[in-house]
Swiss-Prot record:
Residues 156-236 are annotated as: Interaction with NFS1. The active site is at residues 237, 410. One of its GO terms (cellular component) is cytoplasm. Pathway: tRNA modification; 5-methoxycarbonylmethyl-2-thiouridine-tRNA biosynthesis; Cofactor biosynthesis; molybdopterin biosynthesis. This is Adenylyltransferase and sulfurtransferase MOCS3. It holds the Pfam family Rhodanese. ATP binds at residues 90, 111, 118-122, 135, 179-180. It catalyses: [molybdopterin-synthase sulfur-carrier protein]-C-terminal Gly-Gly + ATP + H(+) = [molybdopterin-synthase sulfur-carrier protein]-C-terminal Gly-Gly-AMP + diphosphate; [molybdopterin-synthase sulfur-carrier protein]-C-terminal Gly-Gly-AMP + S-sulfanyl-L-cysteinyl-[cysteine desulfurase] + AH2 = [molybdopterin-synthase sulfur-carrier protein]-C-terminal-Gly-aminoethanethioate + L-cysteinyl-[cysteine desulfurase] + A + AMP + 2 H(+).
Length: 455
């Protein structure tokens, strides 16, 4: 009897806790909604100079206050400094975390994106419970928990040519934690026009870079990169991958440069580029070209006098999301639903998976033949032999004289289109139908098999 009463009591307590949790979630949603509305009206006045630190602040920052290079005056400068963080992802999270911990007076947080499960391995301010919420509000809440004295101003929006210059002018130092060329050019041009130093970092795979632009007569981003790279040569973290600890290292180094700049110590990497190779454990530093007198942004006769359409300038989108290529006509593609119907009908065909081996190791469809895109691009003899044998085997299962269509799949439907173009150019396959599967395996996971891993 006692055991039964305990079970009933526990069940009642669980029900009560679930009701409390539901209420808390509703309050959180309301608070986030209110925050999104109030974020449009942000403080524009500069922070007042600080004459002294409180007793609590002295205790809190005591370990850095005793540094002769920083001291009381440097800490007072940090308390009166406003830093704009563009991007609350793998770089922006550790950067903002250390800026808040060090006592920077105001942090502006710019990001249009929401928290996703794939962010959590490297974006350390966000947690599982906030999936689907705006990154800037998740980050601001975490930073306030860390240091309630720091003013966090979230901007849940993309940085655009219409808003960037006004926003940059409200801050003393800007940190670029973005992951795309249009935003880098936009932020750099805005910093030049506003007269603000720019601390810029990037990370991909096991490598990272860090520099400071437009400081003390040093070069701006356009001085170093007058023309944007071809869009097809740019690899994002979503495409190429990145190790979370790499973004952590670069974000911390970025925070160090921001703190030195804001405290009046001067940055270490103005006119220099720090290169980090995590696999080798190496740090290298190279000197950048000097400020160009003919630079379109910061030169003697600049032509960039206001902000422009940077997506058109770069030929790519101002986002780190995977771009959807359109290399094929609709007739050369098949939807994931139509492919599933074809598969269920047991119609003879060959499914060719062109992802790299490292992605195939994560997940695959068991009936797919794997030949990486790179092997097709270089016409690898062994891969061609395997493909030829698979086509011949497919013909044996088809009606006499019938051809076996090839359907090409990858993660998202981009590399598969490139592969179709390659296969269409081969004379020995000109009699075969070759099509790309729209949306790739992520479409399969979303629309066909909810248990299929997404990565």
């Amino acid at each position: 009897m006692a055991a039964r009463e305990e079970v009933l009591a526990l069940q009642a307590e669980v029900a009560q806790r679930e009701e409390e949790l539901s209420s808390l979630k509703q309050r959180l949603a309301a608070a986030l909604s209110t925050g999104q509305e109030s974020a449009r009206s942000v403080p524009v006045s500069p922070l007042p100079p600080r004459a002294a630190l409180s007793r609590e602040e002295i205790r809190r920052y005591s370990r850095q206050l005793v540094l002769p290079e920083l001291g009381m005056q440097g800490q007072l400068r940090l308390a009166a400094a406003a830093v704009l963080v563009v991007g609350c992802g793998g770089l922006g999270c550790p950067l903002a975390q250390y800026l808040a911990a060090a006592g920077v007076g105001r942090l502006g947080l710019v990001d249009y994106d929401v928290v996703e499960a794939s962010n959590l391995a490297r974006q350390v301010l966000h947690g599982e419970a906030l999936a689907g919420q705006a990154k800037v509000f998740s980050a601001a809440a975490a930073l306030r928990r860390l240091n309630s004295a720091v003013e966090c101003v979230p901007y849940a929006q993309a940085l655009t040519p219409a808003t960037a210059l006004d926003l940059v002018r409200r801050y003393d130092v800007v940190a670029d934690c973005s992951d795309n060329a249009p935003t880098r050019y936009l932020v750099s041009d805005a910093c030049v026009l506003a007269g603000r130093p720019l601390v810029s970092a990037s990370a991909l795979r096991f490598e990272g870079q860090l520099t400071v632009y437009h400081y003390g007569g040093g070069p701006c981003y356009r001085c170093v990169f007058p023309r944007p790279p071809p869009a097809e040569t740019v690899t994002s973290c979503a495409d190429g991958g990145v190790l979370g600890a790499v973004t952590g290292v670069l974000g911390c180094l970025q925070a160090l440069e921001v703190l030195k700049t804001a405290a009046g110590l001067g940055p270490s990497y103005s006119g220099r580029l720090l290169l980090f190779d995590a696999l080798r454990g190496d740090f290298r530093c190279i000197r950048l070209r000097r400020r160009r007198p003919d630079c379109a942004a910061c030169g003697e006769r600049p032509t960039v006098t206001d902000l422009q359409d940077y997506e058109s300038f770069c030929g790519s989108s101002a986002t780190d999301k995977c771009r959807s290529l359109r290399l094929l006509s609709p007739e050369e593609r098949i939807s994931i639903m139509d492919y599933k119907r074809l598969l269920d009908s047991r119609s003879p065909h060959l499914l060719l998976d062109v992802r790299p081996q490292v992605e195939v190791d994560i997940c695959r469809l068991p009936h797919a033949l794997h030949i990486p895109l790179k092997s097709l691009e270089r016409r690898d003899a062994e891969s061609l032999k395997v493909l030829g044998e698979a086509i011949r085997e497919g013909k044996q299962g088809a009606q006499e004289g019938a051809s076996v269509p090839i359907y090409v799949i990858c993660k998202l439907g981009n590399d598969s289109q490139k592969a179709v173009k390659i296969l269409q150019s081969w004379a020995d396959l000109d009699s075969l139908t070759v099509k790309d599967v729209v949306g790739g395996l992520m479409a399969w996971a979303a629309k066909i098999d909810g248990t299929f891993p997404q990565y």
